[in-house]
Amino acid sequence: MKLFAVFLLFCLVNQIYCRRSRSNTVEVTKKCKSGGKDTSMEKVEVEVSGSFYPTLELPDYCTHRRLDDDKCSKFCEHNCNPPFKRGVCGVWGDSQAGNCYCHT
């Protein structure tokens, strides 16, 4: 009976840990508009903890020239997955150039 109780406790702890681990990652799809077409890139999982928000790195061929804030923000918003709704884009001259920051 004790062995069975230990087994149940182990299963419960394992379930809570696994569920928590899964909820701490968000899948982000890297994309870039090229010649009016969406070119899909690989999907990446980014860990989310505390005030850290996932960054969406733009492919090199999207960052050769500075994107204006409006276009860049729209690009980021389009690529932010729930629960992240809004995107802020780092621009050249900024240490975060070429990254989209997704936030709620």
UniProtKB/Swiss-Prot annotation:
GO terms for cellular component: extracellular region. Disulfide bonds join 32-80, 62-89, 72-100, 76-102. Interacts with host integrin alpha-V/beta-3 (ITGAV:ITGB3). Its main location: secreted. Inhibits proliferation, adhesion and migration of host cells as well as host angiogenesis by blocking host integrin alpha-V/beta-3 (ITGAV:ITGB3). It comes from the Eukaryota. A motif (Putative integrin attachment site) lies at residues 92-94. It is found in: Secreted. This is Salivary protein FS145. The lineage of its organism: Eukaryota, Metazoa, Ecdysozoa, Arthropoda, Hexapoda. The keyword Signal applies. It comes from Xenopsylla cheopis. The keyword Disulfide bond applies. Keywords: Cell adhesion impairing toxin, Disulfide bond, Secreted, Signal, Toxin. Residues 1-18 form the signal peptide.
